[in-house]
Amino acid sequence: MEDSKEGTAVQVAQVPRLTSDKVFSALGTSAAGLSAQEAEARQQRYGKNVIQSGKKKSKVLVFLSNFTHMMAILLWVAGVIAFVAGMPELGVAVWLVNVINGCFSYWQESKADKATEALKKMLPSYVSVIRDGQEQKVLAEDLVPGDVLMLEEGDKVPADGRVVRSSDLQVDQSTLTGESNPVRKTADAVLEENLTNAEMPNLVFEGTSVSEGNGRVVVTQTGMATEFGKIASLTQNMEQKESPLQRQLDHLTKQITVFALCMGVTFFLLDVLFVHNGLAASFIFALGMVVAFIPEGLLPTVTLSLAMAVQRMSKRNALVKSLSSVEALGSTSVICTDKTGTLTQNEMTVNHLWTPACEYEVTGVGYAPKGEVRADGKAYAAADDEDLRLLLEGGALCSNARLLPPEEDGGRYTVLGDPTEACLLVSAQKAGLDPKEVERRMPRVRELPFESRRKRMSTIHQLEEPIDGATRVAFTKGAPNEVVRLSTKVRVNGEVVPMTDSLRSTIMNANDSYAADGLRVLAVAYRPIHRDEPGVPASMSQYTPDDIEKDLTFVGLEVMQDPPRPEVAAAVAECRRAGIRVIMITGDYGLTAVSIARKIGIVKGAHPKVFSGLELEKTSDEELRRALKGEVVFARMAPEQKLRVVENLQAMGEVVAVTGDGVNDSPALKKADIGVAMGITGTDVAKEAADMILTDDNFASIVHAVEEGRAVYANIRKFMLYILNSNVPEAVPSAVYLLSGGAVPLPLTTMQILTIDLGTDMLPALGLGSEPPEKDVMGRPPRDPHEHLLNKEVMRKAFMWYGILGAAASLAAFVFAQVQAGWHMGAVMFGVGKDLDPTYVRATTMALAAIVFTQIGEVMNCRTELASVFSVGLFSNRQVNKGILFEVALIVFLTVFPPFQGVFHTCPLGLADYGFLVLLPPVVLALEEGRKAIVRRHLGIDRDGVRIEQENVER
């Protein structure tokens, strides 16, 4: 053994290969356990059997981080500038927006990372051990290497150990491997090479649980040296990841800062050179314009948009823990998914029955006894065929599982015991047998439990009606090769005939064919037991496997699998259409994994690369990355291996989503760009490590979430386009004022500009954030995570098209008001040198209102990228409709009520003014609809925004 401050690190590779006696010797203990003194000495040496917590960020720092990211800092600075520029009310308003946004973000993401605490909750408090030759109860944290543990059904395993005594000991290792089938444990030495620790039949692991039987275990590892501890260490040491959206918002902040400062400097110079104001006055004016060019409403709009997306996703069975994770889903390029329970139903189902005379198909999936046994186009009952009846009765009787009916209407059947045995009961019921009635007619009198060495189990039953002249019968089920080897006879068409090489070959060919498809196969045979049979013990308790499991009569094969979820194939196809690769990483065997992967469309080629955990250990990162470019399936993976796959995909530039439900998945879940945990079967550890939880454990829900994530990013671009385009009509009138040397009075005041940024723009922008996904959102390739939010296309559309339209409308409205009052070309404009001139006030009010009314058309235009807005329904977005009503009501409010007229430099407008304003939205809408139609025709896109060739393929 090696000393360690984190526990003990016994050479586990050697322990499974030792006999029980040698295990005691190697670990310095005995069947009587450690003495109290030795246990205390070892605890001093190895420490407590606890999962240590890593350093965690304090809640105060987490809270403050919501106020110190780049966009928040920009708003703090904007508030300071507003105070310096003599606008304290504005400064307070900007700071208040920042505070509210930060508090809201913290509240949304207030669930701290509790992965380590969740691990601790999975461990028992007290355990039974043998010390000083006596059974004792001790605290689990006081266990040391060499302690002899006593495990019984229902116990949680408190440390890693080597089994030294087993009485049908079965352990649920799903928390570590992800596979739900109980694993039978043996005390025998393992000589087979190329097995991972999790595959060792004589090792048990901390955090797993005993599902059946009992046994004794010598502790080999404690604390952080256990498999559990290693997973905790991997999880703790993971660096906090930054989402693509966080990176893009930081970059956008830099762009906005540079733009605002450049505009401030430009306006300062223009004011000095053309208007000839003093330096101080020009500086204050420039500061006001800097504040005006910072989109104060962008950050809260992004936050609220993400929060609304979280609510929408929860209705589609996806609970998102982190707001920024919503958008990251949209750039996902690879989904690494578990198999059991995510792609499959996690309910073993018999789908074929085979006898030498007939092959039957079994319909229905899951544990619900709904379905039929069919052959040659018709349904069969057990009563119709004696061979079929014996096959089904033998499978049902040679089983310890129990089916529990749903507790409520519409509920699911549940299983007590081995799921593989449970599906045998279901297949019997589908053929009209009642397992309870069968058991009443043939009560069990003896069981010879399954052993991994024998690969079979047998049960002996008393008969009401003789079988082959005997009043007792033994049913044996197990690995087909073993059962066939022990069979000397076969039932064919109701007759018992001798086993021949030809029949043996026929049986094994059928088995091999099913196994090649990744199906699990169990053989069923029986042996009549005559009371006067020579060589059979007189007492039932003296029966041994050697006495019973010989001269068997082979009956048939029961073929089963955990079937794919019915909606998964369509979801995988949708991923392919969206340019997203799906890679299966499972703890199951390679053949089974490939079979399921092929059925649901994850792999299409004839020879996909299949990596086992042991093969992956021998593969370099360079070789792995080459393999990851093609079709690949990973089977029998350990936690650190799954993590390695994720890390290599990320190194290749992929944005990776990972699904998982067990403790073993937590490192990969935390490392992934998006960790997706299962809500039903998932452990607390997996849920805490993940960014998103699926409440229905369904892969299809991930695809819905990706669609929503793509829509969120598209919507952020839409409302960013909407918010930023108003900067042009805010800037151009001011530029006209400056370039005219003051001959054209300032069409918009700073407070009017802030009215647009923090008032009229906010709610319509928020409405754009709730826009449903466009029809072609899953027909596009994944977004490049390095692509900037504010790219050239957005800037061109915002500043060179929408912005110019708004600026033209604003200036036109300003001039319209001047002309209405009698101004003409060559005359001095109303308001020059007279800020309170009534005509000038009316003109600035019109300029402000024109921007607002133009934005009504713009918000409709922004709802779709290329599709006609009429294809989605002009008024179908209620949030946008409410936003439009709000901004119109606000502008009326600011112009009608005297207390606000002085602050915002406004006045009431007349019917002619409103007649001019209401023409603006339809004009803007018509111009953009025309532009979109021209672009669609050029790109071969229909009115709904879908490429015409793609539409034809889908049809």
Range-by-range predicted roles:
Residues M1-P782, H786-L790, I804, L848, ...:
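Conserved cytosolic headpiece of P-type ATPases
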Residues C862:
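A C-terminal functional module that forms or caps the active site or interfaces directly
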Residues A821-P838, P908:
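Membrane-interfacial helical/loop segments at transmembrane boundaries in membrane proteins
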Residues A798-A813, F853:
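Alpha-helical transmembrane segments of multi-pass integral membrane proteins
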Residues L811-V828, V896-Q901:
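Membrane-helix interface motif
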Residues H786-L805, G833-M846:
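Membrane-water interface at loop-to-transmembrane-helix junctions
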Residues T760, R842-V859:
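Generic alpha-helical transmembrane segments
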